[in-house]
Structures are given as C-alpha cells and as structure tokens.
C-alpha cells in the first residue's frame, strides 16, 4: 500500500522486488499445501485469514501479477470463513489475534469486491452479534491485549451500517464517548 500511495519514496523499488520474488504461484502453492495438511482447519483463524484477504484486496489495486498469484490462497481463506462463521455461536471479543470484529473488518472490503456471499454473511453475523449491544463497559485493555475489543466492534459496525444507522448504534453503544468515557478507550 505504501508503494502505491507513495510511489516516489526510496523504498518503492525494494518493495516491488520483494513482491516479485515472494508473491508467485510456486510460493502460494507451498502455502496452500501447508494450509491443507491434516489438523490445519483453524490455522491462523481468524487473524491470518483476514490479513491475507486484506493483502489480496490491496494487490488487486496494482498492475502486477501478484493478485492473480495470491488469489487461490485468498479463496481458500474465504472458504474457511464461509464454514467458520455459521459455527461461531458467540463473537470472540478479546483484544488479541482472535478478535472476530477486527478480522471481519479486514475481510469485509475484500468480500465486497470478490465474494458477495461472504460479504452478506459478514454483514449478517455482525448485525446478529453486535447490533443490540448497548452501553459498552469497555473493561479493557487486558494485560495481554493489543486491540480494543470495543473499538474493533465499532469499526466493524461503521462498515456494516449506513451513516445514520451507525450514528444511532454508536450513541447507544458508547453513550458517554463525547465525555471521554470509558476512560480506558
């Protein structure tokens, strides 16, 4: 993304060279083989899955062959999301790699462009899990957390709801945000 946004920066040539070396069908085939080994169904779920979809979405904005090379891996992770989301009874709200809101935020844009069924599934699950959330307690951050579960949820809902619906949802979810409360956020 940096190379796309700032093509004149000194590091751009090195970024393109690294992409040319790494984002090739042979290397993706190795990743797919690793992913398909027995017992790997949950490998990197959901954080790694989502980051790969975000990477593929960015690569699709470039003229190079990288998006086509990475697409089989993106499709494999999308298939895993399709299978996983209906099984997840409750959202995973921790502030770590397992946070489902953060993962779905990353996957949402990719799904909108590349997999309408997954896009609809992400939006439906987000509404199912979070639409009725009110007066968030925001007992965070935890000692081992690097994400704010509350803010990750809010970011996802900002992508799923239209502007007016999100404003109403956010006002109910964090009703004292304008006063800087909860202070941990």
Task: List the predicted regions and their residue ranges.
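Alpha-helical solenoid scaffolds that mediate protein-protein interactions
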Residues: 2, 19, 59, 126-129, ...
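Extended ligand-binding groove/face enriched in aromatic
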Residues: 2-107
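Positions within ordered alpha-helical repeat solenoids
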Residues: 4, 58-61, 109-113, 128, ...
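Carbohydrate-active enzyme catalytic cores, enriched for enzymes
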Residues: 27-31, 149-153, 157, 163
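Loop-centered beta-sheet repeat module
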Residues: 80-151
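Short acidic alpha-helical/loop segments enriched in Asp/Glu that coordinate divalent cations
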Residues: 121, 141-144, 162-174
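Alpha-helix capping/termination and helix-coil
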Residues: 130-133, 158-165, 177
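Non-catalytic carbohydrate-binding regions of carbohydrate-active enzymes
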Residues: 135, 170-185
